């Protein structure tokens, strides 16, 4: 029996832990290290387990990060999540940069969302460590400036996904740096980057022609100069224009040239009428989600156009606040849009 128990502890349990651990949250997988010396050895030797480091919302994230990156098992880290790690500071990244043997060359995605104590200096330090980064999210770090964009474009040449949402001090200068360095950019989120103007963002649209996802939520200063340029993005599938108060039917007609669009948010685009939505219906026949929330200038005519062109793709339609569109029964809606699973209409 003793021999059987020994085999169970040394071989069976560690093997089971190795099979189970990839399906667990990383924090739980780390806890398994303490089960036994045999589990520790088996799990540490599995490189797939240590490609992600998740310090989201953790206390003392800076010290934890430095300690983790000092371990051999994190040498090939691919994903680092520091979202809402509010105590992370510039000094932690600067310390990592100065440490010998620390490299993040395999890192592909870095999430610094809402790390408010990070400044341009911190961005310079951390991006210098990860030259092969492909995705960077710095959502709502309001103190960052165009200098951060300069550091990012200098240090990370392969960025495909960039989230600058809430970075209110980024200006047209930053947009020009993005345009000149990331022609292959796939995803860009500039929600609430309120200093941007048509001139700077048009350069991005002209040079980053591979864009597939574009989030312009709460940018009310852009005009049809920008929206007409969006129509040249042949690969665009996701477009959020919520609050684009200067978007007109002419601009929307140009956007309708993006035939691959599956997601289009036109919430509070108050200048839009049936004319623009009909153009979208005719040009974007793969739409799965469309929000017309709060647009009083649309009527049942646009629903009829959508039912003719998008009836076999549209699953979500929001016409809440569209007083020109009459209420319909569930059965009537299904006749128009057989795949519809979510329909929001005004009371």
Model regions and ranges:
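Short, solvent-exposed loop/turn at the beta-strand->alpha-helix junction
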Residues: 35, 59-65, 86-94, 116-121, ...
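Conserved hydrophobic beta-strand positions in leucine-rich repeat
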Residues: 53-55, 78-83, 107-112, 136-138, ...
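Inter-repeat linker/turn residues at the boundaries of leucine-rich repeats
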Residues: 48, 75, 86, 102-105, ...
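A structural signal for leucine-rich repeat
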Residues: 68-72, 93-102, 123-129, 149-155, ...
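N-terminal adaptor-interaction module of cullin-RING ubiquitin ligase components
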Residues: 1-101, 105-114, 119, 123-127, ...
């Amino acid at each position: 029996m003793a021999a059987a128990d020994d085999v169970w502890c040394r071989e069976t349990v560690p093997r089971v832990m190795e099979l189970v651990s990839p399906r667990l949250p990383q924090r739980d997988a780390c806890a398994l290290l303490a089960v036994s010396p045999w589990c520790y050895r088996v799990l540490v030797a599995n490189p797939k387990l240590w490609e992600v480091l998740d310090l989201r919302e953790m206390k003392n994230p800076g010290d934890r990060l430095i300690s983790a990156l000092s371990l051999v098992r994190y040498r090939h880290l691919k994903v680092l999540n520091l979202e809402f790690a509010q105590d992370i500071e510039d000094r932690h990244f600067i310390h990592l940069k100065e440490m010998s043997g620390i490299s993040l060359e395999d890192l592909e995605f870095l999430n610094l969302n809402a790390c408010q104590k990070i400044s341009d200096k911190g961005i310079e330090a951390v991006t210098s460590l990860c030259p092969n980064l492909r995705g960077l999210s710095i959502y709502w770090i309001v103190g960052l400036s165009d200098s951060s964009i300069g550091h990012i474009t200098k240090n990370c040449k392969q960025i495909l996904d960039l989230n600058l949402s809430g970075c209110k001090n980024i200006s047209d200068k930053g947009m020009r740096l993005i345009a000149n360095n990331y022609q292959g950019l796939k995803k860009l989120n500039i929600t609430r980057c309120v200093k941007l103007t048509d001139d700077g963002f048009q350069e991005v649209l002209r040079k980053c022609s591979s864009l597939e996802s574009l989030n312009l939520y709460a940018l009310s200063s852009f005009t049809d100069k920008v929206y007409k340029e969006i129509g040249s993005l042949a690969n665009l599938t996701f477009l959020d224009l919520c609050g684009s108060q200067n978007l007109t039917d002419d601009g929307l007609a140009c956007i309708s040239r993006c035939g691959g669009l599956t997601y289009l948010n036109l919430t509070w685009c108050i200048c839009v009428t049936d004319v623009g939505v009909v153009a979208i219906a005719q040009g974007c026949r793969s739409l799965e989600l469309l929000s017309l929330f709060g647009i009083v200038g649309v009527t049942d005519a646009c629903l009829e156009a959508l039912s003719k062109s998008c009836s076999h793709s549209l699953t979500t339609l929001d016409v809440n606040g569209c007083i020109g569109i009459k209420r319909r029964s569930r059965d009537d809606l299904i006749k128009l849009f057989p795949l519809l699973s979510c329909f929001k209409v005004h009371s």
